[in-house]
């Protein structure tokens, strides 16, 4: 089968950082689906692994943690899917990814794709939707009020892939006021269109901007990037006993500013359930099914903003360049082989 992989960490400026390769079709485990991949999306996780991971000698690493496609075969223990089902999923970081014509993925972290979306539009959603949903409802527990805090959440990085779906989930499923950060006119317009109630600039003082809104101290904050830079400001502006979640990988993170307010800090890693095979691993498939339902009801929308035709090394390198630039609005997807 066709695939795209890498055999050594190279900068995205090197045309050999991703390579077109041929691999045997994957073998299925008991609960696996064999999916014919029709579309993929690129996330910061792809970029980080490509730039830092060294595969074993003579081996290729296949990235890709967003896909939509068609089930071509099922393992002997599969219970909920059949050949021909159109599905979408993020997968798990310790198995070969979706930059391949065929991918094996456990059925418990898969759902049928939204009927109203094509494969490219659907492929933009899984990783970011799971990240946003788990952050809001499993980590921050936004349905549990913070005593004395305003029903408001500050989202640092509102226009990226995770931020774009976070805003929609909050607007659709809660009555929480959304304060999103954006620093350019196009990103500000994007987050307002998605449903942000207030937009502030993350290059300026956050506590001063939040105070000027006149809505009180927010109960929650969600930092999607540069958390080491923003954490002291989040500690200052949040209500006592508020909650902060983050998804990035700071080299050093000083949490001491949180102590005097008893602010809790929550890490979200979308791969935890599948990587650790937790008892509630099937929740990821359930979340994706709920997201698909909300999309088909017109209450959520794909965050795909750019589609590249053709899943190959050259096009994936282009997509990696867009993501590495750090100013993506929405998601970039690739469709077709």
Regions found by a protein language model. Name each.
Residues 94-107:
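A structural motif shared across PLP-dependent enzymes of the aminotransferase-like
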Residues 205-216:
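Short amphipathic alpha-helix with an adjacent loop that forms part of the alpha/beta core around
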Residues 85-86, 102, 243:
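Residue-level marker of beta-strand positions
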Residues 299-306, 317-337:
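C-terminal capping/lid region of NAD(P)-dependent oxidoreductase domains
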Residues 24-41, 51-96:
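Glycine-rich beta-strand-centered segment in the early N-terminal region that forms part
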Residues 123-204:
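Mid-domain Rossmann-like dinucleotide-binding core that forms the NAD(H)/NADP(H) cofactor-binding site
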Residues 229-300, 336-337:
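Glycine-rich phosphate-binding loop and adjacent beta-alpha segment
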Residues 98-99, 182-190, 252-255:
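Short, glycine/polar-rich helix-capping loops at beta-to-alpha or helix-loop-helix junctions
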């Amino acid at each position: 089968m066709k695939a795209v992989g890498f055999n050594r960490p190279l900068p995205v400026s090197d045309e050999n950082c991703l390579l077109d390769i041929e691999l045997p079709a994957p073998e299925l485990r008991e609960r696996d689906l064999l999916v014919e991949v029709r579309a993929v999306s690129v996330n910061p996780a792809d970029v980080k692994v490509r730039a830092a991971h060294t595969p074993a000698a003579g081996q290729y690493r296949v990235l890709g943690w967003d896909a939509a496609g068609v089930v071509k075969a099922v393992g002997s223990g599969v219970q909920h899917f059949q050949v021909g089902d159109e599905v979408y999923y993020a997968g798990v970081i310790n198995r070969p990814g979706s930059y391949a014509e065929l991918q094996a993925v456990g059925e418990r972290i898969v759902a049928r794709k939204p009927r109203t979306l094509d494969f490219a539009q659907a492929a933009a959603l899984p990783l970011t939707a799971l990240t946003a949903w788990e952050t809001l409802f499993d980590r921050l527990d936004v349905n549990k009020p913070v005593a004395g805090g305003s029903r408001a959440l500050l989202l640092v990085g509102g226009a990226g892939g995770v931020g774009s779906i976070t805003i929609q989930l909050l607007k659709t499923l809660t009555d929480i006021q959304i304060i999103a950060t954006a620093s350019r006119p196009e990103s500000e317009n994007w987050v307002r269109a998605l449903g942000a109630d207030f937009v502030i600039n993350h290059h300026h003082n956050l506590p001063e901007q939040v105070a000027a809104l006149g809505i009180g101290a927010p109960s929650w904050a969600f930092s999607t990037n540069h958390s080491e830079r923003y954490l002291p400001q989040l500690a200052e502006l949040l209500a006592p006993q508020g909650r902060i979640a983050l998804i990035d990988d700071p080299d050093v993170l000083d949490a001491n500013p949180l102590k005097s307010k008893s602010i809790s800090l929550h890490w979200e890693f979308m791969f935890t359930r599948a990587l650790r095979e937790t008892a509630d691993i099937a929740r990821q498939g359930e979340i994706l099914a709920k997201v698909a339902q909300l999309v088909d009801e017109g209450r959520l929308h794909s965050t795909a903003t750019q589609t590249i035709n053709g899943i190959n090394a050259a096009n994936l390198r282009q997509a990696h360049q867009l993501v590495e630039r750090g100013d993506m609005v929405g998601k970039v997807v690739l469709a077709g082989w």
